């Protein structure tokens, strides 16, 4: 998993407690949610899409406030 650090991704992080990551195409929403819940984070919602370049992007929204920033720091961003 790779954290995206675009303007939109940072805005989502700050305003909506959501991280934006690139994941392997075979990952499902439930697999992504399970990954973060095993680490002890409560996930509210996962949305995925395939980009024009064929990459899979996931938006992961967390239930608890401020968790997205902590997760982003763990994934090597910010």
Swiss-Prot record:
Source organism, top-level taxon: Archaea
Keywords: Ribonucleoprotein, Ribosomal protein, RNA-binding, rRNA-binding
Any one GO molecular-function label of the UniProt entry: rRNA binding
Single GO cellular component term: ribosome
GO biological process, one term: translation
The keyword Nucleotide-binding is assigned to this record: no
Cysteine-cysteine disulfides: none
Keyword Ribosomal protein included in the entry's annotation: yes
Signal peptide: none
Family to which the UniProt record says this protein belongs: Belongs to the universal ribosomal protein uL23 family.
Xref: PANTHER family: 60S RIBOSOMAL PROTEIN L23A
Function field: Binds to 23S rRNA. One of the proteins that surrounds the polypeptide exit tunnel on the outside of the ribosome.
Subunit structure: Part of the 50S ribosomal subunit. Contacts protein L29.
Name the UniProt record assigns to this protein: Large ribosomal subunit protein uL23
Native source organism of the sequence: Nanoarchaeum equitans (strain Kin4-M)
């Amino acid at each position: 998993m790779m954290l995206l650090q675009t303007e939109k991704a940072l805005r989502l992080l700050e305003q909506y407690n959501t991280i934006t990551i690139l994941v392997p195409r075979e990952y499902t929403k439930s697999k992504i949610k399970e990954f973060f819940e095993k680490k002890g984070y409560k996930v509210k919602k996962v949305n995925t899409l395939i980009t024009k370049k064929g990459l899979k992007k996931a938006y992961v929204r967390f239930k608890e406030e401020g968790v997205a920033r902590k997760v982003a720091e763990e994934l090597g961003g910010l």
